[in-house]
């Protein structure tokens, strides 16, 4: 029930928020964001240097698999903590990553960050696009990998710089595992 409400909110936001904005909007292009994180990790001597060459190779393959995209104004950080329910309506909060992106990135982030099942992902795509899920499955799965890669790289950078008391090393390991699983699933499509 809540998932359907969340998907409706995301779709409505993507389709309608632009009419309320009257200033230029930046693009949050996850391929460039990931490349930027990797460059920073390299220049700052990350303990994860040995993983970066493989991540760069995967990034290229996933960008090719994503293909041409439509742009919407996306939230780009759909963690459960960024979706509030006041009992009457849902709210998307924490828009620091907001900007133009493919809707597949928000949908992939929603699924990847919240542990949706394959059936839930397929239903999500059908509800959002009002078309059969299989049309979007391959580019969606590629974007799911990209979303998980972004979260992983962000965590790696946070290991170096964050002053927040949080086990970023464990969070990086968790996300690397989720990313590896997602890439294996993607390769089977």
Residue ranges and their predicted role:
Residues 1-24:
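Conserved kinase catalytic-core helix
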Residues 16-76, 86:
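An alpha-helical support segment within catalytic cores of ATP-dependent transferases
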Residues 23-28, 133-144:
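All-alpha amphipathic helical-bundle segments outside canonical DNA-binding/catalytic cores
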Residues 43, 50, 153-189:
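ATP/Mg2+ or Mg2+-diphosphate-binding catalytic cores
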Residues 73, 91-94:
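Pre-DFG segment of protein kinase catalytic domains
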Residues 82-91:
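Conserved protein kinase catalytic/activation segment
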Residues 104-133, 145-164, 178:
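Active-site activation/catalytic loop segments of kinase-like enzymes and analogous catalytic loops
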